[in-house]
Amino acid sequence: MAYHTPFAAQPPVASSGLPLTLISLDDWALVTLTGADRVKYLQGQVTADIDALSADQHVLCAHCDAKGKMWSNLRLFYRGEGLAFIERRSLLDNQLSELKKYAVFSKVVIAPQPDAVLIGVAGSQAKTALAEIFTELPSAEHPVTQMGNSTLLHFSLPAERFLLVTDTEQAQQLVEKLAGRAQFNDSKQWLALDIEAGFPIIDAANSAQFIPQATNIQALNGISFTKGCYTGQEMVARAKYRGANKRALYWLAGNASRVPAAGEDLEWQLGENWRRTGTVLSAIQLNDGTVWVQAVLNNDLAADSVLRVRDDALGTLAIQPLPYSLAEDK
């Protein structure tokens, strides 16, 4: 089987019913940071403590403006001799221009890597399949491994899955090795798994709209409140210590006559009426017709609240439990 991306699109499947699947992640992009000041520079730009990040760990953190609003969130890790991060391709150019603003004063090179290949490996037997190709696999305890030009990231949520950062040659080998027993899908399958995991999706429509806590990044250990200064730190700290944050990320599931776009609002049922509320971050329709929506809503919303896609008289959405706790933020 010849390697080319994106893989043909199939309706996404929930993690509980997902067979072994290779997923082309063309909707995400890779950026690298190299140079003597790479750690110091990034430490002043993102919410995570980069000084404390070890080579076998990855972290989801935020890159904010001076008001604490996220330009984007970043899946950050070490790769080769430098740092790397993965973010949504839709906001890559704008986010990079913001990140590079002060780089001229530091020994750091920040560069997109358009030739890098990003592939998700998920579903039943994902670990077993990868073990036939890689001699060392990442785990929950050590979620990043490096082998040659390849970096493997492990995710425990919503179920065990892996993200491979590699080159075309290694990707070709993976596809050939697993072609007989794996199915293939495009970025929407990984998007569905991220929604199920409660990992916030920030696309261009929602860039510079939310503080990190409005998307649960603090619950995913993506904010350090003890590190030194970084852009937007004052507003992020205020949200924690003064209770300024009134929003949270939710996973909704149900029926809808259409899949809402990022940036749309939803409607919340109040008696016989519907009130507009919240902001859609991402949405997907599964193979069984169910619609999943990831949205930022008021964080005091009752668990049994009924919502719907805007002006959709035929559908309703219910709040689903996230696989992590927000208790420490209340």
From Swiss-Prot:
InterPro entries: GcvT/YgfZ_C, tRNA-modifying_YgfZ, YgfZ/GcvT, YgfZ/GcvT_CS, YgfZ_barrel
Superkingdom as given in the UniProt entry: Bacteria
Keywords: Cytoplasm, Folate-binding, tRNA processing
Protein name per its UniProtKB record: tRNA-modifying protein YgfZ
GO cellular component terms given for this protein: cytoplasm
Keyword Transcription regulation: no
Lineage: Bacteria, Pseudomonadati, Pseudomonadota, Gammaproteobacteria, Enterobacterales
Residues that hold folate according to the record: 28, 190
Family, similarity comment: Belongs to the tRNA-modifying YgfZ family.
Location in the cell: Cytoplasm
Keyword Cytoplasm: yes
GO BP terms: iron-sulfur cluster assembly; RNA modification; tRNA processing
Function text: Folate-binding protein involved in regulating the level of ATP-DnaA and in the modification of some tRNAs. It is probably a key factor in regulatory networks that act via tRNA modification, such as initiation of chromosomal replication.
Coiled coil: none
A Gene Ontology molecular function term of the record: folic acid binding
NCBIfam families membership: PRK09559.1, ygfZ_signature
